[in-house]
Amino acid sequence: MSDNKIKLCALTTISKTMDWFIVDNMRNLAKNGYEVTLVCNMDDGFAERNQDYAKCINLPMSRGTSIGDLIKMPWKLYRLFKREKFDVVYYTTPNVSLYAAIAGWLAGIKCRFYNQCGLRYVSFDGKKRTIFKAIEKFTCKLSTTVREQSPMNRQFAIDEGLCPAEKISVVGIGGTIGVSLEQVDSFDKNEAKSTLRRKYGIPVDGFVYGYVGRVNADKGINELITAFCQLQKKHDDVNLVLVGMLDDANPITPENLQIAKDNDHIFLTGNVPPSEVYQHMSMFDVLTHPTYREGFGKVLQEAMGVGLPIITTNVPGPSEVVENGVSGVLVKDHDSADLLEKMELMYQDAEYRMSIAKAGRKRAETYFDRPIMLNNILEDLNKTLGV
């Protein structure tokens, strides 16, 4: 350790993931005696936003499957790890986690810390599922420490044989960095709602179902568009707002993408920076998040903080963030009919919406406020390192 500081290298495949899930944690670690290096495929401005507390290294790599990256990246990271002599390599997202686990093991890094945020192989079938499950198991094997995002996902990983129980655990009751209630409470939500609805051409008095995240198949967007179009036949004042980038690696069907572009009541905002997420959520009347799989659901915690009623799926992660019928409503995954039924319920019952929203905010205050989450991570890492 240099100058009594713990040298930590945090890695994600792309910088958007780093921005959304990692940088607040790394900034907190830097304040508490860690020497931090950030490695990812950086977008413009990433280094400038984070260089006040961390060394930033741009490492271009692909999000999708790439044989070229599989050959090159472990070697590049190995040389970086040997040169910098990190005490900890801390990796998140599938591709870079595989590369970093290999490189860290070869370089003799004593703490190889894997944040297992959702298991992509569960959405695959046949040989593809077998291959990607083997990759996940290999990444876990080369890691010294694995942190899963929820208790149910942890148990699933153990049951699937990905990782022995003694190597994998959950920080707090789950999640990553939670929601900044300080930021949520720092702006006028009614003003943000009217301003952003005007910006996107959304009726100010319309009823809005909203989604935040990558617009892809695994997030249940095909089912969401299908359910919304059915609901729209009954209620002409409903709208659907999809906040996030279109995901070419796991796209929705061409038919649904065309529907989203042609329907005057569906709005695609594109990606927005993390600093604007809470304001965009203020446009919504209900958050709809019909994902197939999830680590824990940071966006659900954020929606709770903003005071939104939530519809999400009964899968590991989301079903642990919300209490069904109390702080959220659970639906079956891959089921547009069940989703439609719950969207109709939320539309019809204002009192129920308010009850769900109030309970969700209280739950966010108790478990998911960012200072609580960041302190949990710091204590867990210090305990892991014996400091």
Summary of predicted features, one role per range:
Residues T253-V272:
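Nucleotide-activated donor-binding/catalytic signature segment of Leloir-type glycosyltransferases, i.e.
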Residues Y292:
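Aromatic "clamp/platform" in nucleotide-sugar-dependent glycosyltransferases that forms part
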